Amino acid sequence: MRMAHAISGATVALVLGLLFVAVPARAGGPTVTPAAPVSPVTPVTPVTPVLTGISAAHAASARVDLVRFHFQPAAPAEVTVQYVPASELLQDGSGLPVAVRGRSFVKVVFRNAAAHDEEGRATAPRNLFPVRATTNVVQVRSGGDFEGVVTYFIGLRQPAPGPQVQPTAQHTGTSVIVAIPTR
């Protein structure tokens, strides 16, 4: 019984030692004061990728036109790329039609991204025309920067090749490269 009492007393002393810090008193023995409270962990706010530029080139050996969307600090993870009919060239938020030159169109959507700064100023071109150094891309035009969704439309000289051939998107750290087949 004495052994159990001694162990439980040691356990209490150990627990109290972890919870309190002994501070010498001015007049006499030590006094016990509570340890400083630990502040709650502040959650880390994710940084929104911001579109900072757009460039285009032709890769003859791969038979594709490349449209590169440059972001800071990193490219967004969620990107969709697909051919769409002219009837789907609509402005995000308002639903108004967006005029884009071309015979067929690619819609590029970046989720959890922005194309503006804190004051609402555009951080990337909203319209690239004419697009030089490509064989198929005619125009790259903004379709919206609304509630964390950035949309661009790419107008093409050639008709869409059919459902078996689709444009692709590749992440390269700070960029998303959209590859559009040419003939």
Predicted regions and their residues:
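Secretory targeting and sorting signals
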Residues: 1-27
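Short linear recognition/processing motifs and adjacent strand/loop elements at protein termini
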Residues: 24-183
